[in-house]
Amino acid sequence: TMKRLYIIVEGQTEQEFVKTLIAPYLQKHEIFEVTPILIRTSKTGRGGFVNYQHLKKDAERLLKSEKKDFIVSMFVDFFRCPEVPHKEKWSVKSSHIGQVEEMERCIKDDIKDVRFIPYIQLHEFEALLFASNEGFNSFFDEIQKEKVQQIINSYDNPEDINTTPEGAPSKRILAIKEDYDKVLEGNLIALEIGFSKIMEKCTRFRAWIEKLIKLCKES
């Protein structure tokens, strides 16, 4: 039997993305139960990844069950990511990708469970939107689209788009279109691009999705 999958997310945008893009793709691979879980930061249940302990609590709550018929993963941004354990290990890495990979390892070591797969998006959700100009075409005017195309042309892999605060993917979109609405437009843009194009361009993201499929299929 196929395993269930829970993905801990930091916000509504990621929650929608799991529902509207990741889940339908996984259904093609016969993984039918895919549930995004918003990080609980307070009594109100609002999302946001501001404290590692909140994420850990949510993961451990899901993993408390002894059952082996599910996998728990996470989908959070590297940009503005709060400190995760073992800073001495990940902070010394010189590249962002090195830091992210080490941070994922440190989280894995901290939440010791074979059913748990950490994933941190380099550099943030919006990077995925730069996989193609297709998505922006519907929502941006000609001048805005041209600016987006220049950014797309500068990076083979959108996951490399820089994380200096003003260079972060979301900041770049806001600089082009001031009223960009992350939750609504972000996912509509992603839907326009299509999941296969995002997978093709964003190699770390693709590796994560492929790993989830493999683990959900393992007996």
Model-derived regions, located:
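Catalytic nucleophile-elbow at a beta strand-turn-alpha helix junction centered on a G-D-S/GDSL motif
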Residues: I7-E16
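C-terminal accessory helical subdomains adjacent to catalytic cores in phosphodiester-
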Residues: T1-M2, Q15-T41, K56-S219
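N-terminal beta-loop-helix "entrance" segment that forms/cooperates
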Residues: T41-H54
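Short, flexible active-site loop motifs that bind/organize anionic cofactors or intermediates
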Residues: R4, I8, G45, R115
